[in-house]
Amino acid sequence: MSQRKPDISEQSRDGILRRLFPACIDNAYQGSRIALWILGLMIAVRTTQSVAILVQGSSVAQSADGIPLDSYPAGAAQTIVALFALSAVNRLIISLICVLVLVWYRRAVPLMFLLLLVTYATGQLVGRVFPIVRVGQPPAVVMNLTLLGLTILGLVLSLWKRRSFAAIVSP
């Protein structure tokens, strides 16, 4: 009885799944080094954004996100700022986990990019169901789209298996 040989697409799909969900999480990273730099940049930006919200939540909500806090009663405006702060704490925790992965558990870098992508996608879904009233064209929209692009690029590059120089040079 002959067994069917898996085709190339099945092998690469299995390889991608193994890189996304590794059996062992250690520091043996196989993806592009550029993805590591992208993750580091994203950690820095997300951490800066989160700290800014925690320190000056009202100002950030109005200027960066275009939320007209002055048009709401004081209690409602305070609740909006508190929800922003809670979101910032969650982002800081994810950023801390990203730092741990970047330093000690690099095999999980693709999984972290996937987590960041899922976080963004679910945030967009929630934003469609419960839209936030904004004034003008807030810069946070452009920044978030930039971070989305970097997340997708980082995910692709982290899954892209790095070849050794000898493999590139030899025919």
Model-inferred region functions:
Residues M1-A28:
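Short, Lys/Arg-rich, polar N-terminal cytosolic tail immediately upstream
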Residues A64-V99:
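Core segments of alpha-helical transmembrane spans in multipass integral membrane proteins
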Residues G149-V169:
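Membrane-water interface at the C-terminal end of transmembrane alpha helices
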Residues V45-T48, L117-G127:
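Aromatic-anchored segments of alpha-helical transmembrane domains
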Residues L100-Y120:
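Cytoplasmic juxtamembrane regions at transmembrane-helix boundaries
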